Amino acid sequence: VLLGTNQYPNFNELSEGKEPAEKASCCGGEKKDSCDRPVKTLDNARMASEFEALRLSTEKSGKRPKAFMLTIGNLAMRQARAQFSCNFLACAGYEVIDNLGFQSVEEGVEEALKAKADIVVLCSSDDEYAEYAVPALKALDNRAIFIVAGAPACMDDLKAAGIENFIHVRCNVLDTLKEYNEKLGIKE
C-alpha cells in the first residue's frame, strides 16, 4: 500500500507539468571502489513511480475520464464498495463521482449518462448483483465501460451475461487501470 498513491489518492491533484522521476547518478548502475572493483549500488526506483507514470499519461492525454459510482441497494455495502472504487480509479487520475444511492438501476444509469460518465461502477452487495448488474449493463448499452465492484459468487453468471469488468481486492490495480486507459484510448 502506497498511501496517497494507490490508497487514498488525492482525487483532484494534477501534476502541473511534473515528469516521472528517472534514475539519476549511479544508483542502479555500476560503480567501482578505489581498487577498481565493482561495487553493487542501491536501486533508487520509487515504488510509486509506475502509478505516477500512469496518472501522468492520463493527464497528458488531455482527457480526464469520469468514473460514476452507481450506488444501489444495501447501504453499508454500497458505501464500502464506492469508497474502494473511488480510490481504485482515482489512482489513474480519473475524476470520480460518488453518489448517495439510487432507487433504481434506470435512475442511476440516467444520472451517469447526464454526467457524461466514461466508466460506470455498480456498487452494491454480492447478493444484489444478480438483480442489478445485467439490467444496468443493458441500460448503459455500451455507452460507458461498465464495472462491478467486488467479486460476487454469481460472477460466472454475470460474465456469461456479457459483464467483463470487475474490481476487487485481488485485482492487480496497475494492470487493471492500464487496461481501462487502453479501452479509453489513452496511450502510455
Model-flagged regions — what are they?
Residues 1-124:
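Non-catalytic terminal/interface segments that mediate subunit docking, oligomerization
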Residues 74-79, 128-131, 154-156:
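Flexible loop/turn segments at secondary-structure boundaries
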Residues 124-125, 151:
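Active-site-proximal beta-strand/loop segments in catalytic clefts of secreted hydrolases
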Residues 109-117, 136-137, 180-184:
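Short low-complexity, flexible loop/linker segments enriched in glycine and/or proline
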Residues 138-188:
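Peripheral docking tails and interdomain loops at the edges
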Residues 105, 128-137, 176:
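Active-site-adjacent beta->alpha loops and helix N-cap segments on the catalytic face
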Residues 83, 106, 134, 152-156:
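Residue-level marker for well-ordered alpha-helical positions
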Residues 58-71, 134-146, 181:
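Long, low-complexity, intrinsically disordered polar/charged segments
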